[in-house]
Amino acid sequence: MKRFTLIVLVSLFSLSAWSKKKEFPLIGEKAPSFSESSTNGVLNFPEDFGDNWKILFSHPLDFTAVCTSELCGLAYNQEKFDSLGVKIAVVSIDEIDRHLLWKEFMERTMSEDGEAIEIAYPIVADLSGEVSEKYGMLHASANEKRNVRGVFIIDPDNIIQSISFYPINVGRNIDELLRTVAALQLTQKENVLTPYNWQPGDDVLVPHKPYTEDELKENPELKNQYYNKGEFMWYKKMNKSGKK
């Protein structure tokens, strides 16, 4: 009995230690604040971005192929992020001077359709690793001294709405990032859900049947606004050309 009790206590202690070590903010929780140097000066995150949507985007190392492609991808799509009211901050465990050199290199040598790019978003120098630890971006089994590719999408109230981590050898899909932000914004604004492969303008799901038979009799037009597939999948039409 004593041995069993000891095993249980050791297991609970180990679980507690693991939980503490692995702790980072989750969906629905407040985004941790930090103040660090960046390529745009000192950044107080998320406060400096006000009531905008925010993306915290971590990368492993400056002057590497995948990271360069990703940051250029963010720059190529800057206008799309602006149209969604999104502010971006990029972070890695690199010195500020290295960030500045890398930014200058990308703006000087990278282009899209022959036009030079501008890195408008700040690249944060998290040399101490404190920011990366706060957001759980250091995964020891991958590389304990370098960030994995993390993405935190944060709403205007500074609540985390989406979290994703990618391995060091896989670049992220910027179109998917934009799609996720658009979906989060729509579902916060309206009481709707987005189905698989949803794209902006597509029809959306509603949580339950949107009308009763009595309501339909009073307003027959409701039938033209919604349709169902089976008993519990009800769609709302979004007035996109070619859709129901």
State each model region's role.
Residues 10-18:
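Hydrophobic h-region of N-terminal signal peptides that target proteins for export
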Residues 2-8:
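Sec-dependent signal peptide recognition
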Residues 18-244:
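Chalcogenol-based redox active-site neighborhoods
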